[in-house]
Structures are given as structure tokens and as C-alpha cells.
A protein has these predicted regions:
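Active-site-proximal beta-alpha core segment in soluble small-molecule metabolic enzymes
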Residues: 1-146
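C-terminal active-site-proximal or functional interface alpha/beta core segments in diverse enzymes
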Residues: 122-226
Length: 226
């Protein structure tokens, strides 16, 4: 049971529900206090970064821990996504090369990750991201222990009809195969939207019953809009 988390509040929430789950703190910009609490209070060992300052912060906040899983997030094109995250998060390949080498020195397990952007409508974006990881592997001669292909898997909306999720997984498998590695790293992903976007829950109060009609304190212009 693994969960991607982006804040200390998410960590606390999940740990209250199940204290045994494995958490990955994959936000690349974290406060030193949240890193320290995640590590010492909640047993988090996986942290994401996209710059040297964040790496330094992680090491300081964990007292130079020797059991860290450090994920270097690289920036890739988000051209096929509804929400572009590439300008905000991720290291350019030119910067990632040195960052991968540096993170390797301080991690028990090294990961490389990317994110194709939210609600990605073209599965080829994932193989492009894997191709960029392949370029980094060739230039650094470092094979990561873990590759995280991130999230961005699309859900169905009234004006957006993506291909089935299995097609995205097939594209990822193809991209991994094209890396041509003798030993494959562990492959993980963050499929949150694709799993839960079409579900939801609401708590409402019945104000009036008129024969077979119930009138509640919510409606089309509230949480029932979708």
C-alpha cells in the first residue's frame, strides 16, 4: 500500500486511517519542518527534489539520514496536458545530470521521476518522458533504483474522452522496454485522478418531502454540478 502525498496534512490524514502504509512525499518544494516531521514522526523515507537547495534541506531536516529514497524530478513537455506543470516543477536535463549524481551519493535508493501534466490526453507523453530518463542514464551512467512516471492519467469529462487507461500502460511498457536496461528499476506511478475522478460523496440534509420528491440543501449549482 503506497500513497503519493504533497503535504504534511495529507500524511497525517492517511496515517490516521492506516498507520502501515508507505508514503512518498513527492512535492518538490517542502518546508524543513514538514520534512523533519514526515521523517521522524511518520516514517516517511521517500522525498522528491528538483534542485540542490531542496536536497540540502532534506539532508539537514533528516539529520543526514542514510535510509532515504531520493527522487530527482525532471522537467518534460506538458504540451498534451490540460494543466501544464513543467514550468513550475522539475529540473531541466542539463541541471538534472549533476543533481542525479549528487542525489546518488546521499540516497539508499535513487529515483528519477517526471510528470506529464494534469489530465494528459496523449499517451505518447509518457514514452517521451521515459526517453528523457534514458538520455540521463546514458550521460550519467547511473541507473536509478526506481522510476516514477508520475500522474496526469486522464479521466472522462463531458468534453474530454481519453483513451482507456490500459492504452497508457501499454505505452509506458513500450517506453520502459526501449530503455534497453539489463536490469529494470522498480516502476511506480500516481494514478489518482484516473481512479477517483468519476466518484464522489456528499452529505446533504433533506429539507422537505413532497410525495415522491425530496428537496435537499444542495443542487446543480453546488456539489452536484458534475
Amino acid at each position: 500500500n503506497d500513497f503519493d502525498v504533497a503535504s504534511l496534512n495529507e500524511i497525517k490524514l492517511i496515517k490516521r486511517i492506516n498507520s502501515e502504509v508507505n508514503l512518498h512525499f513527492m512535492h518538490t518544494i517542502k518546508s524543513k519542518e514538514s520534512i523533519s516531521s514526515a521523517y521522524f514522526d511518520y516514517g516517511v523515507r521517500s522525498f522528491s527534489l528538483d534542485n540542490k537547495d531542496e536536497l540540502r534541506k532534506i539532508l539537514e531536516a533528516t539529520n543526514q539520514a542514510k535510509d532515504l529514497k531520493l527522487f530527482v524530478r525532471i522537467a518534460i513537455s506538458n504540451e498534451h496536458a490540460e494543466i501544464d506543470l513543467s514550468k513550475k516543477f522539475g529540473a531541466l536535463t542539463s541541471e538534472a545530470l549533476g543533481l542525479v549524481r549528487l542525489a546518488k551519493e546521499y540516497s539508499k535508493k535513487l529515483g528519477i521521476s517526471f510528470h506529464v501534466g494534469s489530465q494528459c490526453m496523449e499517451k505518447i507523453s509518457y514514452s517521451k518522458g521515459l526517453r528523457e530518463i534514458g538520455n540521463i542514464i546514458k550521460k550519467t551512467k547511473i541507473i536509478p533504483d526506481i522510476i516514477n512516471v508520475g500522474g496526469g492519467f486522464p479521466a472522462i469529462y463531458p468534453d474530454l474522452k481519453p483513451e482507456p487507461l490500459v492504452k497508457y500502460m501499454e505505452e509506458i511498457k513500450k517506453g520502459i522496454k526501449n530503455l534497453r536496461l539489463n536490469k529494470l528499476p522498480e516502476i511506480i506511478c500516481e494514478p489518482g485522478r484516473a481512479i477517483v475522478a468519476e466518484s464522489g460523496s456528499s452529505i446533504v440534509k433533506v429539507i422537505l418531502r413532497k410525495k415522491q420528491n425530496l428537496y435537499i440543501n444542495d443542487g446543480t449549482y453546488g456539489s452536484l454540478f458534475d
